[in-house]
Amino acid sequence: MIVAGARTPVGKLMGSLKDFSGTDLGAIAIRAALEKANVPASMVEYVIMGQVLTAGAGQMPARQAAVAAGIPWDVAALSINKMCLSGIDAIALADQLIRAGEFDVIVAGGQESMSQAPHLLPKSREGYKYGDATLVDHLAYDGLHDVFTDQPMGALTEQRNDVDKFTRAEQDEYAAQSHQKAAAAWKDGVFADEVVPVSIPQRKGDPIEFAEDEGIRANTTAESLAGLKPAFRKDGTITAGSASQISDGAAAVIVMNKAKAEELGLTWLAEIGAHGVVAGPDSTLQSQPANAIKKAITREGITVDQLDVIEINEAFAAVALASTKELGVDPAKVNVNGGAIAIGHPIGMSGARIALHAALELARRGSGYAVAALCGAGGQGDALVLRR
């Protein structure tokens, strides 16, 4: 079960969190999650953290974050790279290990500094005798480029939209609602249960407290988004406004055996249910969250109508629209407090963020079923059922 969790505010690309590494952010989230759970670091038996952009991050980013968070040196850690699925897969793996009897208490989550992703110089080890050399953007190539079709994932999504036929207006309206819902959630204090402020040192004077997601624009409307140019094709429908933001952040949860939590007298947010993992038939993204949700709820033994809370990562508006339609659910149940279009999408973090948010939303409601799902690079999808 998920006992508690915490996340940093999400920073924009080269924004307020640009000077924090992924491991710095991960440590902040882990430390805060332990505090919220009222669990001492000495009780943690294993740490699993997702991170996608690891070039230049140093060995074992998960272990770096764990040690920086005060978790003892004799506690092992595992770094996961399953692209956008990394954070949710970390939680699912933690659940599986606990069910297998390997551990009782695991920290799981995801961390990412997209701002600090370096540029790479391929073939530099063998040297360049003459002429120019080309730098490769680690962020773009290893984070946002579909290797199977050799194009940006946005272009791939645009290509699939020729089949799905979601209009520019539909995507702009969805994106605007994401911002409006997220802004309203912040105003109503919804995110206060999950976000821990980050103290940012200044050259002079006291540190600044960075406390709210940086990318949310409360005044965003479909009309204002209509003025943006297509991002991936001249006649395309996807813009920077209907795609998730490139961002920095981290999230962590405390996953614990139920008997252990009861022994310690702890409350919990939600029990972890079935996990759905899907892939194919190609590298497109739109159907993957829906496919993963269908697999997970079938394993859980429930129907889609029994889901009270549905979190679908907004990699693109087209993905959330397609998966919502394929599930046949009321759109009002999906991403009730906004999503990655407004909040941002630090790729290693997002799976953990939406799982934590779904658990907290379920706890606020008192009972029911929730599911968190994402698409992932290479045409994969993960979903995790939560119940209370």
Curated annotation (Swiss-Prot):
InterPro entries: Thiolase, Thiolase-like, Thiolase_acyl_enz_int_AS, Thiolase_AS, Thiolase_C, Thiolase_CS, Thiolase_N
Ubl conjugation found in the keyword field: yes
Gene3D superfamilies: 3.40.47.10
GO MF term list: acetyl-CoA C-acetyltransferase activity
Stored CDD domains: thiolase (cd00751)
Top-level EC class as recorded in UniProt: transferase
EC number, UniProt record: 2.3.1.9
Keywords, in A-Z order: Acyltransferase, Isopeptide bond, Transferase, Ubl conjugation
Pfam families xrefs: Thiolase_C, Thiolase_N
PANTHER family assigned to the protein according to its UniProt record, in alphabetical order: ACETYL-COA ACETYLTRANSFERASE, CYTOSOLIC (PTHR18919:SF107), ACETYL-COA C-ACYLTRANSFERASE (PTHR18919)
Protein family membership: Belongs to the thiolase-like superfamily. Thiolase family.
Name of the protein this chain belongs to: Probable acetyl-CoA acetyltransferase
Source species of the chain: Mycolicibacterium smegmatis (strain ATCC 700084 / mc(2)155) (Mycobacterium smegmatis)
Lineage: Bacteria, Bacillati, Actinomycetota, Actinomycetes, Mycobacteriales
